Amino acid sequence: LRPALYALGAVLLLGQGVVYSLHDGLVLSRPDTRNLARTWMAANVPPKTKIVVEPVVPDAWASDIGRPYPGTSNGARWVKFPTSRSNVANDGSILPGGGRIVNIEDFERTLFPGLVDRYEKEGWCYVVSGSTQRGRAEAAPGEVPQAIAYYRALESRADVVFHASPYRRGAEPVTFNFDWSFDFYPLAYARPGPEMTVYRLRNGRCAPGGGA
């Protein structure tokens, strides 16, 4: 009896491995949410528009590969807000001068509600957010309360104009885990990529007739 139980256990373990291997292959065969977001942006947001993009995509995401746009200084399709530099230190204090270079893992520590005021004032009307960044903040809100307040301000002052989910219909979102955001092991995933949301701010220069 014991050998039979061992054999059954081995079959079940192998079967589980096959299920997850097939699932992962199927997920990776589908369009990535970041590509879906870019396709929507290319169809709906004119070239040279000022946009804010969280560091959830490569820098080339804002460019048409092999076709540099002549209307921007670096050839990118859109003008990106400089999220890689900030005047906010990791402890929330304000730095003088040109600020500092922001490591990707520290991005959420640079967010605060006043950024939304700046976006509206300067015409950065589209904000592209991804769960591989926002999820960091929501997993440890006590460490980055200003980031949580930033997302609340963004949601209250902007419309969601595009959303792409990596989850299958009816599935509960996976609790934030940085590794699972890239290997898609949980069966809730239907396609690769983070949850992507594009916001359009409503006020300031982003209001109708505001000039942005």
Regions found by a protein language model. Name each.
Residues Q16, L26, T33-A212:
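C-terminal luminal/periplasmic domains and tails of membrane-associated envelope-modifying transferases
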Residues L1-S21:
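Signature aromatic-anchored transmembrane alpha helix within multi-pass, membrane-resident enzymes
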